[in-house]
Amino acid sequence: MEHTTQCKSKQGKPCDCQSKCGCQDCKESCGCKSSAVDNCKCSSCKCASK
């Protein structure tokens, strides 16, 4: 299930949602649509109510 944390952004660049991307970056760049596991693991992004 490693592919859930490593996803590609819309520009094709690899995006590590656990360490590199903020929660909003994870959603916008990596294509996550909710805080659940989608294209990447957004639940791993430290996301407060921002």
From Swiss-Prot:
Annotated positions binding Zn(2+) 2: C15, C17, C21, C32
Keyword Ribonucleoprotein among UniProt keywords: no
Expression triggers: Highly induced by zinc.
Cellular compartments annotated: Cytoplasm; Nucleus
Keywords: Cytoplasm, Metal-binding, Metal-thiolate cluster, Nucleus, Zinc
GO function term, MF aspect, one: metal ion binding
Pfam family, one: Metallothio_Euk
Cellular component annotations (GO), alphabetically ordered: cytosol; nucleus
Location, primary (coarse class): cytoplasm
InterPro entries: Zym1-like
Domain of life where this protein originates: Eukaryota
Disulfide linkage: none
Binding site for Zn(2+) 4: C40, C42, C45, C47
Stated role: Metallothionein involved in tolerance to zinc and cadmium. Binds four zinc ions.
Similarity field: Belongs to the metallothionein superfamily.
Protein name per its UniProtKB record: Metallothionein zym1
Organism per entry: Schizosaccharomyces pombe (strain 972 / ATCC 24843) (Fission yeast)
Taxonomic classification: Eukaryota, Fungi, Dikarya, Ascomycota, Taphrinomycotina
